[in-house]
């Protein structure tokens, strides 16, 4: 859905003027996530360590393997394969928490797993991506590590610190965070998609099918 929405919005951004700011926008989203985190979000690590470990293993073992299987099964080209594998090697993000809530699942456990996998991402994702994707594209794990640290980890830590120091003020503005995050994410996807509109138009169906299968199998 994001791809279809952004494909239409891409006409507004024909010059892709947002592309230079994609990293900043991602940082804004991660900072917003950090503002919503507190020590209690990690409490399930101590209360139910086995379940948390299973969730982390599922995220960083099963999801990449599922992505790799789908890439091979559909015979995707190198660039599409790299994109699908990157999705499989990245943490679930807040969307997994939303799905847990809508499905009446264990939201506290989901939040804890999401928080842990996001923090582990700088260490785990580059190595995983190199392992599965180096046969398709050139991968620099060190550069990827620092990129994730700067764009993901540092903004999250900054958000956690601000929340700890100015919690009262944060509570007043946190209600606006979902809207800000949605705007930032749509802007990011729109900028990236509009820059490769022709290529995406050619492969939209297969991308949608593979990503949908990856998500559905993963949520099982």
Question: How does the language model describe each region?
Answer:
Residues 2-13:
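Single conserved hydrophobic/aromatic residue that forms the stacking wall/gate
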Residues 67-74, 82-87, 94-107, 111-114, ...:
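Generic transmembrane alpha-helix signature in multi-pass membrane proteins
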Residues 41-71, 81-82, 119, 147, ...:
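Entry/N-cap segments of selected transmembrane alpha helices
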Residues 22-46, 64, 154-163, 179-203:
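Hydrophobic transmembrane alpha-helices of secondary-active transporters
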Residues 58-63, 89-91, 110-130, 148-153:
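Membrane-embedded alpha-helical segments of transport systems
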Residues 49-56, 77-89, 106-115, 140-143, ...:
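The feature identifies polytopic integral membrane transport proteins across all domains of life
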Residues 11-17, 43, 71-77, 130-143, ...:
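Membrane-interface helix termini and inter-helical loops of multi-pass transporters
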Residues 40, 47-51, 74-79, 100-109, ...:
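Juxtamembrane helix-boundary/capping and inter-helix hinge elements in multi-pass membrane proteins
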């Amino acid at each position: 859905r994001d791809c279809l929405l952004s494909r239409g919005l891409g006409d507004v951004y024909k010059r892709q003027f947002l592309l230079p700011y994609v990293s900043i926008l991602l940082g804004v989203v991660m900072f917003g996530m950090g503002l919503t985190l507190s020590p209690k979000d990690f409490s399930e690590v101590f209360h139910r360590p086995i379940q948390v470990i299973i969730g982390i293993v599922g995220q960083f073992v099963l999801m990449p393997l599922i992505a790799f299987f789908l890439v091979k099964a559909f015979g995707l080209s190198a660039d599409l394969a790299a994109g699908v594998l990157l999705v499989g090697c990245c943490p679930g993000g807040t969307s997994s928490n939303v799905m847990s809530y809508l499905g009446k699942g264990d939201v506290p456990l989901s939040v804890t797993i999401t928080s842990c996998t996001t923090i582990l991402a700088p260490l785990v994702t580059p190595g995983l991506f190199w392992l599965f994707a180096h046969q398709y594209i050139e991968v620099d794990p060190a550069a990827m590590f620092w990129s994730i640290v700067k764009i993901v980890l540092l903004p999250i830590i900054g958000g956690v610190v601000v929340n700890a120091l100015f919690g009262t003020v944060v509570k007043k503005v946190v209600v606006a965070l979902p809207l800000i995050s949605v705007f930032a994410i749509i802007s990011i996807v729109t900028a990236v998609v509009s820059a490769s509109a022709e290529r995406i138009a050619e492969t939209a169906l297969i991308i949608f099918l593979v990503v949908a299968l990856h998500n559905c199998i993963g949520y099982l």
